[in-house]
Amino acid sequence: MSNKLEQLRKLTTVVADTGEIDAIKKYQPEDATTNPSLILKAAQIAEYAPLIDASIEYAKTQSDDKAQQIQDTCDMLAVNIGKEILKTIPGRISTEVDARLSYDMEGSVAKARQLVKMYNDAGITNDRILIKLASTWEGIRAAEILEKEGINCNLTLLFSFAQARACAEAGVFLISPFVGRIMDWYKAKEGRDFEAQEDPGVLSVTKIYNYYKEYGYKTVVMGASFRNIGEILELAGCDRLTIAPALLAELEAAEGEVVEKLVDSKGAAERPAAMTHAEFLWEHNQDPMAVEKLAEGIRNFAVDQGKLEAMIAAKL
C-alpha cells in the first residue's frame, strides 16, 4: 500500500504551505502558499540573500524615498520568492497583500494590482498567481473587484461561516478556512484535546465544503492551518489542502488507508440572497472565536511584516 501522502493526492490537490524551495522540491505539490510570516522566515535563509539584494536594487530604481524603497523591496521580495517557487511547481503561487490593508478596500485593490504587475513584468501570467487577502468585509469586496479584472484571489484568515458565505457570494476563486487555529481557541477555552472527527476546525471546513457543493458555488475550498495529520485526513476529499512541510513528512512516513471524507454532492439548490454588510457583521460577530482569531491573525501578520521591513531597512 502506498503511503498516506500518495493516497491523499488521489483525493485532494495537495498544496505546500511554505516559502522554502527545498521543501517544495522534495514534496512536489501542485501549488504553494506564502504569507508575511513565511516570507519573513524564508528571507532569513542564506540561499535567498541574492533575492533580497535584487529586490533592494529594484526598489532603488523606483524611488529615492527610503520608506517607499522599503515597501517596494518587500513587495518585490515576495514576488521574487514566488517566481522561484513557480519554477518548481506546475500550479499557482499565493502571495499576500499587506495585512495592514485588511480594512482598506481601495488600498488592497491597489496593492494587489501592483503585485500582479510585478509578476506580469517578469513574464508570469495571471493564471499562475493567487492574491491572498484577509476575509474581512473590505477584503472580500476587494476580491470581488479583482476577480472581475481577471485577478484570482485566495481569501485567508477565514474562521466563520459568515466569512465563507460572503466569499462565495462575491465569486472569489478560493478560500482558505483555518483548521488548527480554530482548534487552538476551543482547546484553550475548554481545556481539553479533540479527536480529529470532533475537531471544531475540521467541523467548520466540512460545513463550508458541504454548503458550497449543495448550492453549486465554484469557489475552491482549501483547508489550511493544520496542527496534526489527523485533521488533514478527516478532510480527505476537500478541493485542496495546504500543508506545512513537517506534516507532509509525517503523511509520507505514515502507512494505512486514506478514506475519502468529503464528497462533492454536485447540488444545484436555489441560493439564498447575498448577505448585506450589516448581516455579515451580525453573523460574524455571533462567533467569538472567529472575531478573536481574525483580529489576532491580522495583527500577527502585521507584526511579521514590520519585522521584515526592519530587516530590509537595515540593508538599505
From Swiss-Prot:
<dbReference type="Pfam" id="PF00923">
    <property type="entry name" value="TAL_FSA"/>
</dbReference>
<protein>
    <recommendedName>
        <fullName>Transaldolase</fullName>
        <ecNumber>2.2.1.2</ecNumber>
    </recommendedName>
</protein>
<dbReference type="GO" id="GO:0005975">
    <property type="term" value="P:carbohydrate metabolic process"/>
</dbReference>
<comment type="function">
    <text>Transaldolase is important for the balance of metabolites in the pentose-phosphate pathway.</text>
</comment>
<dbReference type="InterPro" id="IPR001585">
    <property type="entry name" value="TAL/FSA"/>
</dbReference>
<keyword id="KW-0963">Cytoplasm</keyword>
<dbReference type="GO" id="GO:0004801">
    <property type="term" value="F:transaldolase activity"/>
</dbReference>
<keyword id="KW-0570">Pentose shunt</keyword>
<dbReference type="InterPro" id="IPR004730">
    <property type="entry name" value="Transaldolase_1"/>
</dbReference>
<dbReference type="GO" id="GO:0005829">
    <property type="term" value="C:cytosol"/>
</dbReference>
<dbReference type="GO" id="GO:0006098">
    <property type="term" value="P:pentose-phosphate shunt"/>
</dbReference>
<comment type="subunit">
    <text>Homodimer.</text>
</comment>
<feature type="active site" description="Schiff-base intermediate with substrate">
    <location>
        <position position="132"/>
    </location>
</feature>
<comment type="similarity">
    <text>Belongs to the transaldolase family. Type 1 subfamily.</text>
</comment>
<dbReference type="InterPro" id="IPR018225">
    <property type="entry name" value="Transaldolase_AS"/>
</dbReference>
<keyword id="KW-0808">Transferase</keyword>
<dbReference type="InterPro" id="IPR013785">
    <property type="entry name" value="Aldolase_TIM"/>
</dbReference>
<keyword id="KW-0704">Schiff base</keyword>
<comment type="pathway">
    <text>Carbohydrate degradation; pentose phosphate pathway; D-glyceraldehyde 3-phosphate and beta-D-fructose 6-phosphate from D-ribose 5-phosphate and D-xylulose 5-phosphate (non-oxidative stage): step 2/3.</text>
</comment>
